[in-house]
């Protein structure tokens, strides 16, 4: 047993995923509220006087009320050390969300009770399934009129292909929402209105057999609840921890993050059901988190978190052992020993220096420009590399025009920094130079973020000219193919990425297929490692 086992077993590192506006950021805030990390939960709604969400810190986020970066939030609760990877809630930022999911051991899926499973939920769910991590479901906004509860469960099972096991059950919805019935204790948790959820909610626990239960709900609601419980006991899957751990069964909870209904109950159950840090695959095999030897990988790079200092932070997920700020480590890709500078942990925009951290924790270190996403850091005696983080094909492309050529140096620095963070991808025409830059993004809002950040952080103005391309492909067998001799369609464009890899841009799927037909030895792929 590792001498760090006790500390590592306390860790719970998870991401919260959802479709935009399902209430993910509000739920995150309430976790922090119950954990004592904040004293007053602020509404994420966009009035000028409203408090900004704790996990939204970039200026453009505060102005628009969306999360466009991934925040890392740590707090303690009931003996656990919790690391929340708060992923971007806006649908345009799924690639950054994907990388963040690579650092999580489990995921909380937030679903709007009035809308059910939505587009981004499906996409992010597939990523979790691919990683075989446990998935927990919180059906939110039950204080509003919601879809039929059984229909919601059926939709999750059919749309996402995962079995469901409700741990609690809502009593009504909308104006008739009275709380939740806990299937484990056979009791009802009733919640009071807590100043629109800005304070920890107080609740009363009452047995379903208690005559006073009719003070909480009317006889019709009680009869309906009893009928639903009977149906649920006969039809739903039984809780199976092994199936949950494999990502084959999702425990389901109901509540309202805005008013605190069901939030603490969910948090307590979740922490017991979810996993401590999981082993990670590397080129040497699985790396045990309980190992005494330190190891970590970079899953995110964020430049200019402090505008005044133009700093750059590399976020690392610790995979095994203990991090000690005084220790020397080995940067595998850089092939050199080093000390990690200014190690810190984050609470949105605030940060504090850390001397030690354990497997499951996320730390940010000062990056002088040597780290890339996916890099491995380990103890000097262990020179292995964790599996790389894939780069996925962007869906939108534009040519970048610099409006003031005298600011070329700032422009090149800025756009390269933003690209290294993974918010955008940069391409150049084959045999071109930095004078002609094509930017690819997963969602069109990232174009706005690019313009905003270049102007506000680097004092550079650009114009973006949209390009008609909708598909991009890496060449998997580039060593065996002469790129110059690829016979494509007239609208195909040959480009390279920042690593010098050749790629092909296509206007439509037909062009992709035609190029593959004309070049039978060519192997194209939608992502690059």
Where are the model-predicted features located?
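Structural and coupling elements of P-loop NTPases
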Residues: 1-529
């Amino acid at each position: 047993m590792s001498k760090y086992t006790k500390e590592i077993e306390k860790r719970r590192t998870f991401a919260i995923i959802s479709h935009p506006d399902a209430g993910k950021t509000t739920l995150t805030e309430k976790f922090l509220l119950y954990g004592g990390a904040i004293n007053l939960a602020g509404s994420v709604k966009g009035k000028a006087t409203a408090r900004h969400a704790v996990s939204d810190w970039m200026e453009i986020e505060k102005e628009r009320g969306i999360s466009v970066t991934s925040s890392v939030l740590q707090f303690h609760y009931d003996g656990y050390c919790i690391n929340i990877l708060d992923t971007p809630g806006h649908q345009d930022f799924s690639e950054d969300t994907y990388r963040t999911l690579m650092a999580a051991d489990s995921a909380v899926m937030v679903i709007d009770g009035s809308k059910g499973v939505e587009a981004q939920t499906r996409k992010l769910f597939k990523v979790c399934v691919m990683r075989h991590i446990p998935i927990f479901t919180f059906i939110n906004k039950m204080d509003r009129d919601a879809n039929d509860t059984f229909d919601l469960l059926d939709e999750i099972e059919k749309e996402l292909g995962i079995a469901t096991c409700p741990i609690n059950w809502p009593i009504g919805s909308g104006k008739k929402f009275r709380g939740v019935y806990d299937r484990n204790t056979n009791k009802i948790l009733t919640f009071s209105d807590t100043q629109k959820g800005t304070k920890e909610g107080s609740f009363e626990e009452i047995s379903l057999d208690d005559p006073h239960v009719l003070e909480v709900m009317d006889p019709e609601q009680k009869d309906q609840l009893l009928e639903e419980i009977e149906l649920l006991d006969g039809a739903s899957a039984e809780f199976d921890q092994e199936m949950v751990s494999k990502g084959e069964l999702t425990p389901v909870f109901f509540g309202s993050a805005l008013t605190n209904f069901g939030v603490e109950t969910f948090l307590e159950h979740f922490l017991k059901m979810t996993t401590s840090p999981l082993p990670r695959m590397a080129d040497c095999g699985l790396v045990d988190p309980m190992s005494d030897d330190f190891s970590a990988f970079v899953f995110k790079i964020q430049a200019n978190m402090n505008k005044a200092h133009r700093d750059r932070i590399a976020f690392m997920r610790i995979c095994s052992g203990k991090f000690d700020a005084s220790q020397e480590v080995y940067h595998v890709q850089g092939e050199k020993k080093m000390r990690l500078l200014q190690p810190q942990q984050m609470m949105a925009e605030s940060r504090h220096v850390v001397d030690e951290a354990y497997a499951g924790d996320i730390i940010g270190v000062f990056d002088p420009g040597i780290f890339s996403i996916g890099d491995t850091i380990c103890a000097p005696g262990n020179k292995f590399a964790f599996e790389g983080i894939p780069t996925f094909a962007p869906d939108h492309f534009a040519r970048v025009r610099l409006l003031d050529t005298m600011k070329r140096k700032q422009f090149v620095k800025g756009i390269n920094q933003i690209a290294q963070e993974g918010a955008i991808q940069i391409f150049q025409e084959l045999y071109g130079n930095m004078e002609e830059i094509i930017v690819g993004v997963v969602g069109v809002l990232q174009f706005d973020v690019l313009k905003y950040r270049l102007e506000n952080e680097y004092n550079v103005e650009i114009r973006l000219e949209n390009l008609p391309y909708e598909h991009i492909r890496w060449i998997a067998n580039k060593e065996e193919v002469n790129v110059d001799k690829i016979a494509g369609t007239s609208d195909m464009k040959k480009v390279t990425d920042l690593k010098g890899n050749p790629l092909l841009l296509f206007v439509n799927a037909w062009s992709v297929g035609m190029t593959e037909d004309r070049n039978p030895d060519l192997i194209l792929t939608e992502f690059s490692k």
